[in-house]
Amino acid sequence: MTGIAGRQKGRHYNMKCQEIIERIERRFPREYACSWDNVGLLAGDRQQEVDTVYIALDATDEVIEAAVSSGAGLLLTHHPMIFGGLKSVTADDYTGERLIRLIKNGISYYAMHTNYDVLGMADLAAGMLDLTETEVLEEVLDGEGIGRTGRLPKIMTLEECGQFVKERFSLPNVKIFGELNKMVATAAISPGSGKSMARPAFEAGVDVLISGDIDHHTGIDMADCGMAVIDAGHYGIEHIYIEDMKKFLEKELPALKICTAPARQPFQVI
């Protein structure tokens, strides 16, 4: 047997960074990202030899240090470090300092944000809640889009739904807007920041929106309009990206060593 799939199991081999990118973009094309987003190779060399990939949600100092320690040649994150127009890269600011550190250590940097939300995260999250009769919450391209709506596995109280979300996504807590004894049968789930999804979810007629980063006014307004909201936090649902991409790369590119950031909330509640 020849090729990557036929190489000896347990051994890792160098690949061009571009080869890895092509395999990722075959499954998660960049054109499915929202127009405001910044995805793809954000720093580094497409011809660089890579044998280790480090996967994380964000390119924090801790993540970059771990990527360096692991010997990674490619850092793969969900959230892009660079969003707006970057006019300079210097050690005088936080973003520039991190980019310099990556480049100095020979680590290319790739972000896959809303293209992954559209083509991976939404269905994965809906599946973890056992939603049925699912539909796209807000279309982006070719019938694919952000979030999903569907029927919960059973009718339950809003409080029970909150506990269900905590259990399925391994969360210590969630915030709930709405009466805890309200019965819910349908839900919209939109991982990440869900304020912009409140209106589409309300128009879809679901009983509860499950998302993150719901501000005070959006939460109380939606509850007053009859749609409950469960705020699982920005990280709370999106952390599933790390393990999902690990499985994807291990299956698609078994010659690579895949390392991941630990799954934990980036803050503490005291």
Where are these regions (language model features)?
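Hydrophobic structural segments
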Residues: 3, 7-270
